[in-house]
Amino acid sequence: MVKALQGAAQNLPADVNQLIDQLERHCLAPDGSLVTKSVYSDLQLAREEMSRERLRYLEAMAIYCEAVAMVEEYQQAISVANHGGIRDVQGLYPQLGLKNSPQVYETLEHRLVVAEAAQKLRLPLISDGGEIHEEEIEKWSILSRSSLDSASTSFTISSTSNSVNYANSSANSVAGGISLSAVDTDVVGGVPNRFLGITPAYLSYVQLQNTISMDMADYQMFLAREIEGRLKEKCDKLADAIVDDTDSSTGNRNSSARLPERVKFIIEEIERDEAALREDLYSADRKFAEYYNVLEQILGVLIKLVKDLKLEHQHKYNEMQKTWLCKRCETMNAKLRVLENVLLLETYTPDSISALHNIRNYLVEATEEASAAYNKAVTRLREYQGVDPHFDTIARQYHDIVKKLENMQWTIHQVEMDLKSHD
């Protein structure tokens, strides 16, 4: 856009160009986005903060996913042992990648359940020292009471912060629960401060009562080591998947250490490819615009040729064709009149006129007799209908009886003929 302004500035006065240069030098951002320097610096800070937040979120989500996967694999081992009657459950741990005792996984599962329930209740987590801040409790309690449905809209700012805080604290085994008095007053969206029948007071009681028998430091160390090992294994697999031919030929084993460099190199290569493709696209667009302009010019020339040359001759040809068709129609009309006169001449000869008169008289007499018979029949029918309104029904029944009688007579005649043939 700055280049466009610079191109347009060539036609502007000198004082306007000087003003634009001063604005670009002292007020506008150096990237050509046409925003002020203060806004540009705030935007850069916001982008850096968003990048850091995204990095923290991804780290927390990776730890949380590994913790959930550990609990699922532990439950899978227990299920296989129960169905298969295996007494040595710990023998299945190495096959599933589990390296700690059942107490660690049970404690982790318990803390996951409590933390997720606290998140659904929109409650703050217990602090590192086990203390509960009354100010935060009151704030979140007011937010929870004002909600109509505490279970349907869990993706809010509070639930997001709780999930991030919990995912960060899952490796450090920070307990999740709080002590609140349950409010049992029904509202439109259900009972507030409840989720599937779980109240804050019950959640706090479960969290504070269920303490593990092992040392907290050992629990945190075991959990952190296993999560670190699982993440490192996945990083090694990812590095092996994207390693180039040079590294694979030299047999470099320290692939996880160079993973960020490889990822950065691949990202830069993809960005270069995208820039090249974008440049090709712009070049293709420019060529297409040029081709389109040439085609428009060619089309204009063709239209001019058609209008100036071909259409003029076409109009003359159409006029001649119309005249020829009109003459042909007149000729056909004359031929039809001739055929009509010939037909009349051949039909009305001196010999056939007397015969035609006789035929006409016969047809007139036959028409009069038929009309008289029809009128007589109509008159008699009306007389019969006047005598009996059901005459039509009786006549139809009589007709049916006569047909049946004729059929019976024909059948009797056939039987008599068969008997005579047998005699």
UniProtKB/Swiss-Prot annotation:
Identification of the protein by name: AUGMIN subunit 4
Keyword annotations from UniProtKB, A to Z: Cell cycle, Cell division, Coiled coil, Cytoplasm, Cytoskeleton, Microtubule, Mitosis
Assembly, per entry: Part of the augmin complex composed of 8 subunits. The complex acts on microtubules and interacts with gamma-tubulin in spindles and the phragmoplast.
PANTHER family in the cross-refs: AUGMIN SUBUNIT 4 FAMILY MEMBER, HAUS AUGMIN-LIKE COMPLEX SUBUNIT 4
Localization terms from the record: Cytoplasm, Cytoskeleton, Spindle; Cytoplasm, Cytoskeleton, Phragmoplast
Gene Ontology biological-process annotations: cell division; spindle assembly
Pfam (any one): HAUS4
Encoding gene (name): AUG4
Deletion phenotype: Lethal when homozygous.
Residues forming coiled coils: 267-287
Similarity-based family: Belongs to the HAUS4 family.
Domain of life: Eukaryota
